[in-house]
């Protein structure tokens, strides 16, 4: 049992697992921010453009069940905005990484044979 706990601790404290945990927490917080942006800023403007339509209240009844398709539309808008924001973030991040990875142009090192030939020629001239 102790060995299993040690293995679990080692697994849980690896960089990748901690990075994933931090990413999940930040992602959840980011999702709340985007949902607030969509619900409180974007959708009211869309509603005004569409004649005062409030998407969150859109629904219809089937028997005793209520189908709230307005909430579904709201979720789709949330998803599109979150996906676009992540796309932009990844695109910017990869452009920074590519800039850092671009090798600096180094002067080509002459091959060893060329040096040897030059040394040979210099030695021949000195012997004359």
UniProtKB/Swiss-Prot annotation:
GO molecular function terms attached to this record: mechanosensitive monoatomic ion channel activity
Cytoplasm found in the keyword field: no
GO CC annotations, alphabetized: plasma membrane
Protein topology in the membrane: Multi-pass membrane protein
One Pfam family here: MscL
Bilayer-spanning residue ranges: 11-31, 70-90
Domain of life: Bacteria
Keywords of the record: Cell membrane, Ion channel, Ion transport, Membrane, Transmembrane, Transmembrane helix, Transport
Compartment(s) of residence: Cell membrane
PROSITE patterns the record matches: MSCL
Role summary: Channel that opens in response to stretch forces in the membrane lipid bilayer. May participate in the regulation of osmotic pressure changes within the cell.
Family statement: Belongs to the MscL family.
Subunit structure: Homopentamer.
Protein name: Large-conductance mechanosensitive channel
Organism: Listeria innocua serovar 6a (strain ATCC BAA-680 / CLIP 11262)
Gene label: mscL
């Amino acid at each position: 049992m102790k060995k299993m706990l040690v293995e679990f601790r080692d697994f849980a404290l690896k960089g990748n697992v901690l990075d994933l945990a931090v990413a999940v927490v930040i992602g959840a917080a980011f999702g709340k921010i985007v949902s607030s942006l969509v619900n409180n800023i974007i959708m009211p403007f869309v509603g005004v453009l569409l004649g005062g339509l409030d998407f969150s209240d859109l629904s219809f009844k089937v028997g005793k069940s209520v189908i709230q398709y307005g909430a579904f539309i709201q979720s789709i808008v949330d998803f599109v905005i979150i996906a676009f924001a992540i796309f932009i973030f990844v695109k910017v991040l990869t452009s920074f990484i590519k800039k850092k990875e671009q090798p600096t142009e180094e002067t080509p090192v002459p091959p060893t044979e060329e040096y040897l030939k030059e040394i040979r020629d210099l030695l021949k001239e000195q012997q004359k």
